[in-house]
């Protein structure tokens, strides 16, 4: 129907629309109803609401993210928004709801089992050394590796893996298969009961607690879903002077196992500003990191899709083709 598809947006900003259009035309309603659990009438009613909205935001949470077909499902949500140009338009867009306040920040900092070559290369240049290029495990593969005895040690920095992973039985089995299970935590949780051969519970400071190191009180940074980066500093006295920060715990583990020839781990523990100075050497969007944090509310990292700039070889938004 005329006016249903934003042809100007697709012509100027998108690719693979014709292939996607053909796939949709070839898909039978019986198949759609069987997969969705909804009737054609119900879907048509929802589509009518969408068609009469000038701007639309699609929001989803962990039920989609941890779905068996999560990637394809999210790609279809993106396709849905591309059809009417609901990216890079005021009041429109995509809004994933994460299960933790700093999940997006973790990804930005490179916590990824398959980091991009450019990210690794930038670290190698900064450190003047060679780093491993072999991909690691995502959660699913990590659990399977523990069960198969291909991995022996599990170190969890925060969170509650036993309750958060989607297959509870397999998660329990994997954690109990460990030679060593280390939990760095602010509070007791179910993961501490899945022990394995040996287990350590390492209490750490929470974000509300004062973090005092050699150079004085420290703060960390977080990135929210809307790409805002800001400082987070506790103001409550720690429950004990013996409780260490996450950074101190990880830094001391690294110092004990890797040594300090390449990285001065103790210097990073003593002054978190030095960590941020290293980050800005690897990630250009964090230039003048410490200085920009002085602005009230932090700073905006930017979102290329919001500006309708597409950072891929085609330089265009791509309709995903999922059979």
Regions found by a protein language model. Name each.
Residues 1-90, 97-278:
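Non-catalytic alpha/beta scaffold blocks inside enzyme catalytic domains
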Residues 267-323:
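Long, low-complexity segments enriched in small/aliphatic residues
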């Amino acid at each position: 129907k005329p006016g249903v598809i934003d042809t100007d947006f697709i012509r100027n900003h998108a690719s693979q629309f014709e292939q996607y259009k053909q796939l949709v035309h070839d898909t039978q309603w019986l198949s759609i109803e069987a997969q969705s659990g909804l009737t054609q009438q119900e879907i048509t009613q929802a589509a009518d609401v969408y068609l009469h909205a000038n701007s639309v935001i699609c929001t989803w949470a962990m039920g989609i993210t941890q779905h068996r077909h999560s990637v394809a499902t999210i790609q279809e949500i993106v396709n849905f928004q591309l059809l009417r140009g609901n990216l890079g338009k005021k009041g429109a867009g995509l809004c994933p709801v994460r299960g933790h306040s700093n999940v997006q920040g973790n990804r930005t900092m490179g916590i990824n089992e398959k980091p991009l070559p450019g990210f690794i290369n930038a670290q190698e240049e900064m450190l003047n050394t060679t780093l491993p290029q072999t991909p690691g495990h995502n959660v699913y593969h990590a659990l399977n590796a523990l069960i198969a005895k291909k991995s022996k040690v599990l170190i969890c920095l925060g969170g509650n893996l036993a309750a958060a992973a989607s297959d509870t039985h397999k998660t329990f089995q994997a954690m109990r298969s460990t030679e060593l299970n280390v939990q760095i935590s602010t509070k007791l949780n179910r993961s501490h009961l899945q022990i394995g051969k040996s287990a350590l519970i390492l209490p750490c400071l929470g974000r509300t607690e004062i973090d005092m190191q050699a150079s004085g009180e420290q703060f960390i940074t977080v990135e929210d879903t809307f790409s805002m980066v800001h400082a987070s500093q506790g103001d409550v006295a720690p429950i004990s002077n013996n409780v260490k920060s996450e950074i101190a715990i990880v830094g001391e583990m690294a110092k004990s196992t890797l040594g300090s020839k390449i990285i001065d781990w103790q210097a990073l523990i003593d002054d978190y500003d030095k960590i941020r100075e290293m980050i800005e050497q690897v990630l250009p969007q964090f230039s003048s990191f410490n200085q920009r944090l002085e602005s009230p509310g932090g700073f905006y990292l930017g979102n290329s899709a919001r500006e309708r700039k597409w950072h891929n070889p085609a330089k265009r938004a791509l309709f995903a083709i999922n059979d």
